[in-house]
Amino acid sequence: MLVYLAEYLTRFHTGFNVFSYVTFRAILGLLTALVFSLWFGPKLIERLQLLQIGQVVRNDGPESHFSKRGTPTMGGLLILAAIFISVLLWGDLGSRYVWVMLFVLGSFGLIGFIDDYRKVVRKDTKGLIARWKYILQSLAALLIAFFLYATAANPGETQLVVPFFKDVMPQLGAVFIVLAYFTIVGASNAVNLTDGLDGLAIMPTVMVAAAFALIAYLSGHAQFANYLHIPHLPGSGELVIVCTAIVGAGLGFLWFNTYPAQVFMGDVGSLSLGAALGTIAVLVRQEILLVIMGGVFVMETLSVILQVGSYKLRGQRIFRMAPIHHHYELKGWPEPRVIVRFWIISIFLVLLGLATLKLR
């Protein structure tokens, strides 16, 4: 929004040209989201407490989690508000990338909100029926996938980038829709499964978003894109604003979500943030890289799939409890140790993912 105002004011003073630089607006976007989260966080927590919107804790979970019962949840509303305000202020509203991301965050945030509302307000421990949640996620993801395929302006927007191989970038055609669908829905649910400990999901989300900010910036510049053998995607620089807004909002939320948490993000936060990461990966053609950098999310998801599959096929469980972070809790690891070690793994995987841009 302010880009247009700055463009007009440039007629009177050339100093306003600085707002045309993506990097400058990205920094302002990060700071805006961060300050907004830190400023309104306490107010939201107080409001959630007054409304008695508290976390529902499973009776069959680790005993250490029983103390979390009643902790304010749906804090993802704070994250979404910070991102929306930041992007609307500093993003180029003429960019389709911006509106795609706002739609993703809004639609998946709404699905998560309905799920949280049923759990904590209507006291329905199951929340939104899994079948309906999946149907709604699928509808939103397919809308995005079809839109991106139909509006692709150059061949690079539907190619698949394969890490470690600089000359392997197959044209996907209509398969793009299928890959985009599974990436968005898969990432959304993966982050949701990871969000089981204080700060466990938000920090890897911040790290992956920061990495994608760099990738989006490089993809938007022909010289960098050609040098790194990645698709040149004109206009993708606007995704940098979205990514840094996620980073700022996430760090601000972590201030209150770090152990012991004062607030949880709920499904309204985890489903929307996961879908956002998946969509960014699709937009910059780095779906495989998301699997690497978001390895913690993949690990959590696979642990659930293996646990359920093993129990149904063999009648035996592989882990003491799934997702896998609960397994380590039941082994006796203190919650902060599990969290920080998963963060360390995430740092390593994000750096590995960034290294693949050059290791080709």
Curated annotation (Swiss-Prot):
Its EC number is 2.7.8.13. The chain crosses the membrane at residues 26-46, 74-94, 97-117, 134-154, 168-188, 199-219, 236-256, 263-283, 288-308, 338-358. It holds the Pfam family MraY_sig1. Disulfide bonds: none annotated. It catalyses: UDP-N-acetyl-alpha-D-muramoyl-L-alanyl-gamma-D-glutamyl-meso-2,6-diaminopimeloyl-D-alanyl-D-alanine + di-trans,octa-cis-undecaprenyl phosphate = di-trans,octa-cis-undecaprenyl diphospho-N-acetyl-alpha-D-muramoyl-L-alanyl-D-glutamyl-meso-2,6-diaminopimeloyl-D-alanyl-D-alanine + UMP. Pathway: Cell wall biogenesis; peptidoglycan biosynthesis. Its cofactor is Mg(2+). One of its GO terms (cellular component) is plasma membrane. GO terms for molecular function: metal ion binding; phospho-N-acetylmuramoyl-pentapeptide-transferase activity; UDP-N-acetylmuramoyl-L-alanyl-D-glutamyl-meso-2,6-diaminopimelyl-D-alanyl-D-alanine:undecaprenyl-phosphate transferase activity. CDD domains: GT_MraY (cd06852). It is found in: Cell inner membrane. One of its GO terms (biological process) is regulation of cell shape. Keywords: Cell cycle, Cell division, Cell inner membrane, Cell membrane, Cell shape, Cell wall biogenesis/degradation, Magnesium, Membrane, Metal-binding, Peptidoglycan synthesis, Transferase, Transmembrane, Transmembrane helix. Coiled coil: none annotated. InterPro entries: Glycosyl_transferase_4, PNAcMuramoyl-5peptid_Trfase, PNAcMuramoyl-5peptid_Trfase_CS. It comes from the Bacteria. It is a multi-pass membrane protein. Catalyzes the initial step of the lipid cycle reactions in the biosynthesis of the cell wall peptidoglycan: transfers peptidoglycan precursor phospho-MurNAc-pentapeptide from UDP-MurNAc-pentapeptide onto the lipid carrier undecaprenyl phosphate, yielding undecaprenyl-pyrophosphoryl-MurNAc-pentapeptide, known as lipid I. Belongs to the glycosyltransferase 4 family. MraY subfamily. This is Phospho-N-acetylmuramoyl-pentapeptide-transferase. It comes from Shewanella baltica (strain OS185). The lineage of its organism: Bacteria, Pseudomonadati, Pseudomonadota, Gammaproteobacteria, Alteromonadales.
